[in-house]
From Swiss-Prot:
<feature type="binding site">
    <location>
        <position position="424"/>
    </location>
    <ligand>
        <name>acetyl-CoA</name>
    </ligand>
</feature>
<feature type="binding site">
    <location>
        <position position="75"/>
    </location>
    <ligand>
        <name>UDP-N-acetyl-alpha-D-glucosamine</name>
    </ligand>
</feature>
<keyword id="KW-0808">Transferase</keyword>
<dbReference type="GO" id="GO:0009252">
    <property type="term" value="P:peptidoglycan biosynthetic process"/>
</dbReference>
<comment type="pathway">
    <text>Nucleotide-sugar biosynthesis; UDP-N-acetyl-alpha-D-glucosamine biosynthesis; N-acetyl-alpha-D-glucosamine 1-phosphate from alpha-D-glucosamine 6-phosphate (route II): step 2/2.</text>
</comment>
<feature type="binding site">
    <location>
        <position position="228"/>
    </location>
    <ligand>
        <name>UDP-N-acetyl-alpha-D-glucosamine</name>
    </ligand>
</feature>
<dbReference type="Pfam" id="PF14602">
    <property type="entry name" value="Hexapep_2"/>
</dbReference>
<feature type="binding site">
    <location>
        <position position="364"/>
    </location>
    <ligand>
        <name>acetyl-CoA</name>
    </ligand>
</feature>
<keyword id="KW-0677">Repeat</keyword>
<dbReference type="InterPro" id="IPR050065">
    <property type="entry name" value="GlmU-like"/>
</dbReference>
<dbReference type="InterPro" id="IPR038009">
    <property type="entry name" value="GlmU_C_LbH"/>
</dbReference>
<dbReference type="GO" id="GO:0008360">
    <property type="term" value="P:regulation of cell shape"/>
</dbReference>
<keyword id="KW-0961">Cell wall biogenesis/degradation</keyword>
<dbReference type="GO" id="GO:0071555">
    <property type="term" value="P:cell wall organization"/>
</dbReference>
<keyword id="KW-0012">Acyltransferase</keyword>
<dbReference type="InterPro" id="IPR025877">
    <property type="entry name" value="MobA-like_NTP_Trfase"/>
</dbReference>
<keyword id="KW-0479">Metal-binding</keyword>
Amino acid sequence: MSRSRSAIILAAGQGTRMKSKTVKVLHKVAGRPMLDWAVALAGDCGASDIVTVWGAHSPAVRDAAEALGTRTALQDPPKGTGHAVLAARAALADLSGDAIVLYADTPLITAATVARVFEALEGGASVAVLGFEPDDPAAYGRLITNEAGDLDRIVEFKDASEAERAVGLVNSGVLAAPAELLFDLLGEVGNDNANGEYYLTDVVGLARARDLRAAVVVADADEVLGVNSRADLAEAEAAFQSRMRQSMMADGVTLIAPETVFFAHDTQIARDVVIEPNVVFGPGVVIEEDVVVHAHSHIAGAHLKRGAHAGPFARLRPGAELGEGSKVGNFVEIKKSQLAEGAKVSHLTYIGDASVGANANIGAGTITCNYDGYDKHRTVIGDNAFIGSNTCLVAPVTVGDGAFTATGTIVTQDVPADALALARTPQTHKPGWAARFNAAKQARKARKDSQT
């Protein structure tokens, strides 16, 4: 890469078809706002200068873009895509390199595809346009090429002849050119059209009028899927999940029922991991080799170390860390807690704000009582400790190495190493009580029945 690169991300659309109080480009695909996808793509393709163009109706976009480290430019009023790109000119620090126009509502374009667009410029094209061939070209603008395969013009559907409408190669909107040339051409774009707008696509015709070469780079249709509605959002999510499932399996992950497993944008899973059906991964998950995630589990912000097991019906929340060979079983929730090597939490348990030592065993129904209504408090369970079923651990509290808690104990004080904690009412027996109770109840029922 010999020339510097910049990226202009168009994010000023109103997105009314989403029917949402949330701005369209802040809706998420795979747990990540679409704007974040675009900014990450710009960075991945080597853009050192990124400008996000936002609209006056959506200051939340400006705030989000600035939080992501991009410059911002306001398009007000909105007068088309060409006008939006022009709005970014003052915010760009350097016009000496190449610039690419990306869209914040097109989240699935890969860095490899964008690299091919820049390669077209490096190969001698003055303008490079990203096109695709959808199953149904519908009303997309057609990319008309010449005999050499270069782009001759972009024809909007409403202006296309029958022969041009038969062309299957259409415009994605993504366009790259040397920045200085791009803005020079945009300065010549007029708005003599039904909408009175300035169209970025006119740049191609203006470049050809100067006898400059324009190239087409073809992408898969799934990559350039634009999101304008909830249905489009669902389609983008499905496309991402399909891509991720194939990638995971190609990298050595077993998915028993791939179509039922859902990943986040940043899920990291090592080889020889087995994922059973109906598992959902939120952001921030790292899974090491030989882990098994059983069916119907939900995992977010968690780290599962080598050989750990989770589920079925496990919920691992942010900050959960499962040590090597540890086990979290059915109907167990772990939050902001660390399980050391070989620890077992097999069923019906909540562990929050805690550390569980190596080879400790947590019995069914155990609860760490970590919240007093104002603050969270920590529970520490030592190595080889045994927590009896139905134990309540009232934090802050420590159970020492090798200590036991008796079933049903409410632990409110630290338990020394190798001690037994027992805190429950002594069991007493009342001889004959059950017979007397049953006789009284039956007599009462008989009297009531006789009165009806």
